[in-house]
Amino acid sequence: MSDETALPLQFTEAAASKVKVLIADEENPDLKLRVYITGGGCSGFQYGFTFDDKVNDGDMTIEKQGVALVVDPMSLQYLVGGSVDYTEGLEGSRFVVTNPNAKTTCGCGSSFSV
């Protein structure tokens, strides 16, 4: 069993590769991809992504390919067992969360309920 399977949230190779490209474009190697959950959206909660150059007390950091994904403790409790991925398709390119804790999700996949 690898260390990756023990993590509460997976950070896919595709997501890490895209983060690496975006950070290189910004020319700031201290940036990390932060995933968070806020109230809102059509299903009650919604996912958010931003680049952040700091890690707060209690944040979980997951590193892959020399880049980091950061999640605050409150958001992590809703994301345990999930994954952060990057897709390109007819709907455009975007980071997506696969969340096994979501009972319902909206059509675009950016909001959910538990």
From Swiss-Prot:
Single annotated GO MF: 4 iron, 4 sulfur cluster binding
This protein's record includes keyword Iron: yes
A Pfam family reported for this protein in Swiss-Prot or TrEMBL: Fe-S_biosyn
Cofactor: iron-sulfur cluster
Residues reported in the UniProt entry to bind iron-sulfur cluster: C42, C106, C108
Biological process per Gene Ontology, one example term: iron-sulfur cluster assembly
Transmembrane segments: none
Textual note on the cofactor: Binds 1 iron-sulfur cluster per subunit.
Keyword line: Iron, Iron-sulfur, Metal-binding
The keyword Iron is assigned to this record: yes
Superkingdom to which the source organism belongs: Bacteria
One cellular component (GO) term of this entry: cytosol
Subunit-level organization: Homodimer.
Annotated NCBIfam families: iron-sulfur cluster assembly accessory protein, PRK13623.1
Main function: Required for insertion of 4Fe-4S clusters for at least IspG.
Entry's family note: Belongs to the HesB/IscA family.
Identification of the protein by name: Iron-sulfur cluster insertion protein ErpA
Natural source organism: Serratia proteamaculans (strain 568)
Lineage, uppermost ranks: Bacteria, Pseudomonadati, Pseudomonadota, Gammaproteobacteria, Enterobacterales
